[in-house]
């Protein structure tokens, strides 16, 4: 089902040089379309672009079930003299021009048979301006009465902001009701007819009178619809939400039926009413003819008892034939198919239409049902259902994205912590005991002592590595710590001696100088002998 908002709007020019000019168009968003006509955004109409800016939105008509009906309404409003539904009435608007002419055509169009069956809403955005135009129209054409609200036509004065929040923003279901609330009208009256006309079965069908019972019944019906276990009241086949029609007195009436089933019921009731009217008129005609015949015969004195009895007998036979033919005119025969009498009656009635045009009583509570109101309620529920499903889908997607983002944040935080524990950060100064233990073994101490002795004697520390076969750990401080660190870096001779003598705590300055001289002294005899 098409759940878009279809409307036909009326614009008028605010330019003093174009006073009274109007524009009629179709759209699904009249507020956005008005901005296009005024040039605020692109894709405006060529006719409104040439002259007339700025334009003002006077009113719009909504409630169309699909775009084809709305486009037909727009064409009839734009070309009333070519429309078969208005061209016979356009003589009333002779001498009326510009904006009052457009408003007068709207008055006639909303009363046309085709659109009077639909449940439409007239939204008036500029009540003062429209009031002046209607007053001017009434002064020129008094034969056209002003529009009044009916059971199918709704007239409301509304601002553009309120209109957007109710019909265009998707927050509500098109008539101000919340999308996630109960779709029943809790304060609905038990009946729109007087109590004297209401049959007893209507009272018996009102089982849910408290608000708790109404919501409980709504939840139960919703569960049955979701499980495809809610039957149609006319054919007993399961219904599919939200594509079914219901009585206007829901939940006080339990009628829920398929669209085609209720349309057949409307057609059947229309034919029954037509047959009853035709039968009554036939009886009246025959009884009038018979009474006139008897009166004429009694005045002439020529009618005898035998002729009068024979005529009475023929009249009774004709009445019996008519009643028997009417009793045989049920929709379904014993085999469940449409009877031949109904087929011939449907074929012989040219005024029957596919869509019901007359109100019909509810098969359960006798409440008058308007076909346009039923279809409007069906579309409203379809819009609510669609928006509710979109809202649930959006919430699920947002929840899934939030969960995934949280999972990514947790994993990245854990990874950073593990990396921080695995290796130090760049530029961080290493402690002396980071790679070596705090204590040095006995073998390590002996190797360090031998190495120090060789250094003091002027020997190379890298010539003999047997002393460092044991894995030693650097002490936290002192000479041994420096010796271990120097051996790992592979620094030789003079550097070892210099740093060793500088960092030694027990050596004097004289000993340090002697060590340096021994290492740097050049022996010429040894060099020549070599």
Swiss-Prot record:
Its cofactor is a divalent metal cation. A zinc finger (SLX1-type) spans 232-365. Signal peptide: none annotated. GO terms for cellular component: Slx1-Slx4 complex. Keywords: DNA damage, DNA recombination, DNA repair, Endonuclease, Hydrolase, Metal-binding, Nuclease, Nucleus, Zinc, Zinc-finger. It is an enzyme of class 3 (hydrolase). Residues 276-306, 410-438, 474-502 are annotated as: Disordered. It is found in: Nucleus. Residues 4-89 form the GIY-YIG domain. Its EC number is 3.1.-.-. GO terms for molecular function: 5'-flap endonuclease activity; zinc ion binding. Residues 283-298 have a biased composition (Basic and acidic residues). GO terms for biological process: DNA recombination; DNA repair. It comes from the Eukaryota. Catalytic subunit of a heterodimeric structure-specific endonuclease that resolves DNA secondary structures generated during DNA repair and recombination. Has endonuclease activity towards branched DNA substrates, introducing single-strand cuts in duplex DNA close to junctions with ss-DNA. Belongs to the SLX1 family. Forms a heterodimer with a member of the SLX4 family. HAMAP family: Endonuc_su_Slx1 (MF_03100). This is Structure-specific endonuclease subunit SLX1 homolog 2. The lineage of its organism: Eukaryota, Discoba, Euglenozoa, Kinetoplastea, Metakinetoplastina.
């Amino acid at each position: 089902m098409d759940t878009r908002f279809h409307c036909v709007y009326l614009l008028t020019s605010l330019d003093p040089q174009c006073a009274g000019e109007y524009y009629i168009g179709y759209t699904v968003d009249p507020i956005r379309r008005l901005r296009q006509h005024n040039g605020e955004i692109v894709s405006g109409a060529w006719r409104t672009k040439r002259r007339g800016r700025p334009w003002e939105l006077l009113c719009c008509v909504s409630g169309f079930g699909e775009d084809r009906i709305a486009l037909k309404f727009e064409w009839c409003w734009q070309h009333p003299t070519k429309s078969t539904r208005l061209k016979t009435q356009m003589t009333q608007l002779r001498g009326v021009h510009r904006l009052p002419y457009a408003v007068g055509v709207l008055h006639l169009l909303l009363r046309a048979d085709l659109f009077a069956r639909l449940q439409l809403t007239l939204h008036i955005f500029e009540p003062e301006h429209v009031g002046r135009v209607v007053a001017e129209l009434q002064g020129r054409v008094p034969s056209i009465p002003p529009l009044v609200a009916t059971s199918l036509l709704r007239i409301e004065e509304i601002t553009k902001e309120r209109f957007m929040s109710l019909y265009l923003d998707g927050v509500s279901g098109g008539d101000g009701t919340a999308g996630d609330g109960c779709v029943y009208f809790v304060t609905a009256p038990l009946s729109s007819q007087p109590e004297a006309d209401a049959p007893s079965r209507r009272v018996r069908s009102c089982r849910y009178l408290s608000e708790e019972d109404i919501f409980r019944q709504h939840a139960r019906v919703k569960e049955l619809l979701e499980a495809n276990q809610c039957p149609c009241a006319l054919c007993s086949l399961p219904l599919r939400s939200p594509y079914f029609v219901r009585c206007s007195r829901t939940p006080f009436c339990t009628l829920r039926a398929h669209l085609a089933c209720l349309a057949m019921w409307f057609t059947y009731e229309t034919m029954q009413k037509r047959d009853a009217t035709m039968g009554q008129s036939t009886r009246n005609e025959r009884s009038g003819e018979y009474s006139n015949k008897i009166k004429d015969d009694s005045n002439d004195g020529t009618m005898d008892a035998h002729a009068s009895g024979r005529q009475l007998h023929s009249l009774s036979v004709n009445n019996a034939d008519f009643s028997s033919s009417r009793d045989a005119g049920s929709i379904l025969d014993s085999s469940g198919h449409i009877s031949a009498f109904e087929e011939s009656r449907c074929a012989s009635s040219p005024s029957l239409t596919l869509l019901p045009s007359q109100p019909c009583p509810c098969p359960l509570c006798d409440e008058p049902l308007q076909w346009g109101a039923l279809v409007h309620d069906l579309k409203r529920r379809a819009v609510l259902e669609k928006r509710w499903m979109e809202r649930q889908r959006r919430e699920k997607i947002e929840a899934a994205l939030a969960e995934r983002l949280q999972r990514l944040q947790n994993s990245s935080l854990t990874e950073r912590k593990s990396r921080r524990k695995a290796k130090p950060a760049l530029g961080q100064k290493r402690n002396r005991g980071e790679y070596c233990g705090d204590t040095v073994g006995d073998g390590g101490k002996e190797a360090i002592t031998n190495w120090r002795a060789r250094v003091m004697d002027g020997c190379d520390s890298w010539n003999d590595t047997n002393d460092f076969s044991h894995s030693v750990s650097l002490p936290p401080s002192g000479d041994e710590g420096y010796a271990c660190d120097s051996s790992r870096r592979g620094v030789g001779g003079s550097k070892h001696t210099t740093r060793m003598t500088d960092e030694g705590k027990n050596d004097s300055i004289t000993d340090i100088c002697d060590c340096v001289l021994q290492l740097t002294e050049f022996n010429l005899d040894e060099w020549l002998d070599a």
